[in-house]
A protein has these predicted regions:
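Hydrophobic/aromatic-rich core segments of domains that either
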Residues: 157-237
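Sequence-level motif detector for i,i+2 pairs with an aromatic at +2
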Residues: 7-9, 40, 110, 201, ...
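Sterically constrained small-residue positions within well-ordered secondary structures
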Residues: 3, 36-38, 146, 164, ...
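Active-site-proximal helix/loop microenvironment
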Residues: 153-154
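Secondary-structure boundary elements
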Residues: 76-150, 161, 227, 236-255
Length: 255
């Protein structure tokens, strides 16, 4: 994948039939719901998904943002600074990494990119067996201590590690679960990534596994403090019953 633009596309409109999703997550930046119709247990939805890298005015604000030392974030954002049993940034090993990697850095843009680079390279092996267990509902992702020890994981473990680094430096960060679709490069599949909160901007998508900002091909369906907090009953239920691209917009996107 490239820098936020797959195949050069900065905006994609998807038409889908969905079974399980969170409406607030679905209709939040960088997505917006264009049409929504409920039929029994199936929702017919059209959304527009945009690339952050193509939003130059937003990026200008993000690049100048600094960590809020007073933590004066909106009340609904504060929970995304808290540790969880799976994403516990208070672990001494994680704190050592965060302090070495990020030090006293206050620029949010720099913190995000350093965190992305570290998370995307620290995990060395994709864990197929763990992926199967998560798909079956037998695992809710590996915790930070396990990730640091094994250096193996799925997209969820890249995301957990990145979120821990962000929260350790007072950057609110949340766990995103959704679906990726952009043929012929991407035939479709469930995926996990993260979003960082920036004062004056809101939530910004990032993909820790790819080490990049979020892509417009990543369709956000759930958000939470960690994977269990997303409230997904069955991971297979978030796979769209049908999905097609109605249109897309080309744009030159550069880091």
């Amino acid at each position: 994948m490239g820098y936020g633009c797959v195949g050069g596309y900065a905006q994609i409109t998807y038409k889908m039939q969905l079974r399980d999703f969170n409406r607030a997550a679905l209709d939040s930046y960088p997505q917006r719901v264009i049409s929504f119709q409920q039929t029994d247990s199936i929702c017919h939805v059209t959304i527009q998904s945009s690339s952050v890298m193509a939003d130059t005015s937003l990026l200008k604000v993000v690049k100048s943002a600094v960590v809020d030392p007073g933590l004066s974030y909106p009340s609904d954002v504060l929970p995304f600074l808290e540790p969880t049993s799976l994403i516990d940034y208070r672990l001494p090993e994680l704190q050592t990494i965060a302090d070495t990697l990020l030090g006293n850095e206050k620029n949010v843009w720099s913190i995000i990119w350093k965190g992305l680079k570290f998370a995307s390279t620290y995990i060395e092996v994709f864990d197929d067996s763990l992926a199967m267990e998560i798909d079956k509902g037998n695992s809710f992702t590996a915790d930070i201590a396990t990730i640091l020890r094994r250096r193996k994981g799925t997209c969820s473990e890249y995301t957990n590690l990145f979120i821990a680094l962000m929260r350790s430096k007072s950057v609110p960060c949340r766990f995103i679960t959704g679906y990726v679709y952009y043929p012929p490069q991407i035939t479709g599949g469930t995926h996990a990534w993260a979003e960082c909160y920036v004062n004056g901007v809101g939530w910004i998508p990032v993909d820790p596994q790819a080490g990049q900002l979020g892509f417009p091909v990543e369709i956000k369906l759930f958000a939470g403090k960690d994977y269990p907090d997303c409230g997904i009953k069955d991971l297979s239920d978030i796979v769209p019953l049908s999905i097609e691209i109605e249109n897309d917009t080309y744009s030159r996107c550069k880091k």
